[in-house]
């Protein structure tokens, strides 16, 4: 596996970065070759720029330096990774350092009115407003994320505040994700709080928001190619089962038109999975995305992550479906951010504890 991953004959690009990281992980985890792993992780770090990837590089460099007793350098690597506390690996590094939440993540940014923005009279912005009035949210998002490609921090805040003022979290997230590509973090827009968190008493509000954010980006109109519907992207067959369990009349139409109905059924299904896996958020999140059958297969291959002797971090890295692996990471990182934003206080970062149990 190492030979195939490391002899890629590439010098840059996304595939180069992925293969360098994989070569480093194999070297450290399976070959007991930390110095070799360090070289690959450094190559990966130099090849990437996004917050998620930079945090990933810092975390694994910290791990390999910790393994070779270079504790001072490991702390520096973890600290660099922890600068990206909105990310999965940034939170792993923060947890390793015993850090609490960065206050900027739950303090609302300086509220700048979009009405005073430099772009307010531009054709693209005016078109986005018309699309919003016509309830064409996907097209509205296209226009606003295009604008976000070139705006500075303050103008991005103003643009996201239009979406916030008009209760369009789907567009807020799109703007924030575009800003994050340039290293500009807008926490309120990146992790918008919605009243949907109160629609079910079966799950903590941060879990509902984290799942809905990943599933639909809080877009009630979302429909997947597989036929999953609405905020929680629940399949009609699953929704029918959950409606029967809750004593509700099943309505496919309401899955898209009634956000409370959608969230109640989606939350009931996720809660069923959490109970099935005896409180494991990690297994329940993976099953919500890939299905319980696949998760049970992975447990046979890689062990039970509820076992204290099994690393939940390594278990996540071994999820063979890239989509599910990424899904678990994105939902997990959102949990802590939503928890502190809802409560308005700094809390110790506890990502691995969240994955281990509910």
Show where each model-derived region lies.
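Catalytic glycan-binding domains that act on GlcNAc-containing polysaccharides
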Residues: 1-23, 32-36, 41, 50-56, ...
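TPR-adjacent "capping" and linker segments in tetratricopeptide-repeat scaffold/adaptor proteins
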Residues: 10-15, 109-122
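N-terminal pre-domains immediately preceding structured catalytic cores
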Residues: 46-48, 56, 131
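Long, contiguous interaction/recruitment modules in multidomain scaffold/adaptor proteins
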Residues: 86-90, 95-104
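Short coil/linker segments at helix-helix boundaries
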Residues: 103-115, 186-188
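Extracytoplasmic low-complexity/disordered linkers and repeat tracts associated with LysM-containing
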Residues: 113-116, 127, 349
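Alpha-helical segment of the N-proximal tetratricopeptide repeat
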Residues: 122-139, 143-146
């Amino acid at each position: 596996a190492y030979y195939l991953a490391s002899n890629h004959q590439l010098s840059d690009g996304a595939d180069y970065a992925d293969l360098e990281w994989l070569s480093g992980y194999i070297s450290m985890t399976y070959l007991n070759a930390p110095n070799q792993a360090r070289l690959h992780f450094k190559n990966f770090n130099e090849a990437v720029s996004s917050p998620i990837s930079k945090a990933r590089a810092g975390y694994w460099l910290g791990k390999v330096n910790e393994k070779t007793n270079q504790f001072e350098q490991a702390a520096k690597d973890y600290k660099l990774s922890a600068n990206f506390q909105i990310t999965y690996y940034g939170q792993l590094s923060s947890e390793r350092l015993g850090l609490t939440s960065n206050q900027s993540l739950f303090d609302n940014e300086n509220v700048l009115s979009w009405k005073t923005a430099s772009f307010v009279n531009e054709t693209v912005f005016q078109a986005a407003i018309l699309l919003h009035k016509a309830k064409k949210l996907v097209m509205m998002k296209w226009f606003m994320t295009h604008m976000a490609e070139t705006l500075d921090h303050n103008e991005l805040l103003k643009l996201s505040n239009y979406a916030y003022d008009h209760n369009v979290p789907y567009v807020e997230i799109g703007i924030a994700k575009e800003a994050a590509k340039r290293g500009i973090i807008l926490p309120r827009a990146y992790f918008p709080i919605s009243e949907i968190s109160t629609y079910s008493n079966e799950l903590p509000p941060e879990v509902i928001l984290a799942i809905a954010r990943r599933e639909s980006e809080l877009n009630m109109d979302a429909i997947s190619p597989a036929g999953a519907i609405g905020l929680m992207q629940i399949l009609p067959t699953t929704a029918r089962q959950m409606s029967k369990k809750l004593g509700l009349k099943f309505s496919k139409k309401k899955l898209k038109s009634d956000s409370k109905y959608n969230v109640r059924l989606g939350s009931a299904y996720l809660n069923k999975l959490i109970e099935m896996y005896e409180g494991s958020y990690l297994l329940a999140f993976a099953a919500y995305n890939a299905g319980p059958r696949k998760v049970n297969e992975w447990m046979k291959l890689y062990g039970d992550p509820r076992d204290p002797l099994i690393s939940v971090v390594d278990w996540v890295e071994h999820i063979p479906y890239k989509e599910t692996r990424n899904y678990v990471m994105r939902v997990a990182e959102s949990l802590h951010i939503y928890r502190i934003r809802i409560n308005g206080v700094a809390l110790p970062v506890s990502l691995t504890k969240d994955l281990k149990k509910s």
